[in-house]
Amino acid sequence: RYALNAANARWMSLYDSLYGTDVIEQSEDSASQRYDPLRGEMVIKYGRNFLERYFPLENIIMGWANITGFKIENGSLIICKDSQETKLKDKSKFIGHRGEANNPSAIILKNNNLHIEIIIDPNAFSAQQDPAKISDIIVEAAVSTICDNEDSVAAVDADDKVICYRNWLGLMKGDLKSTFEKNGKTYERKLNPDRSYISKDGKGLKLHGRSLLLIRNVGHLMTNSAILLKDGSEIPEGIMDAFITSAACLHDIKKKGNSR
């Protein structure tokens, strides 16, 4: 489950991250199980300031805080405030969209080779306080992830190593899944697919849906009883790790799925 979380951490919700942490100051209401609308407003405001900072508009008087909608015209992102229209100051930061050009459901922007996705969903609960019906801002976060075979997962004996190798194999084959229960409900977690959009020139656009996965093998001074040599001695654990994890990677090399 945690390996899946790490692999899927390439794209994360800015709104969830803000609402659930102390980036925004906590109040008594926000600490309860109930939704705090005041905190929700603060999350939206923070999100708008984030967009203002990294994706400023041509018409600075309008500003991200005042926009009411989006549309795509001739490959350009048009940002609306009622009857007023403006564009990004740096138009190259608009990459593509999802949905209809005159009523997009998502806008994809890029800054310093990292992407963000503005989700527009008037039916979402989180969009009810938003004049542009933005329900979330998804940010490209963990571009790479290191999967450990030693200390951080406390892999000591043969049984532990088999679990590590099985998880790594599932990640490389793309079929790793985890089922768990929470609050009386059963959930299944699996690897995220690529993210699909329409580029500014009207063609299909795909972005990696998962982190680029790296593997950390054990140092060569350690040995492990999982495999015994002819003389009965334990195999050097680093060699065992290198051989088995590399063999698992062959599945990914054939279909080129890692970081997707």
Describe every region a protein language model picked out.
Residues R1-R260:
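Catalytic alpha/beta active-site cores
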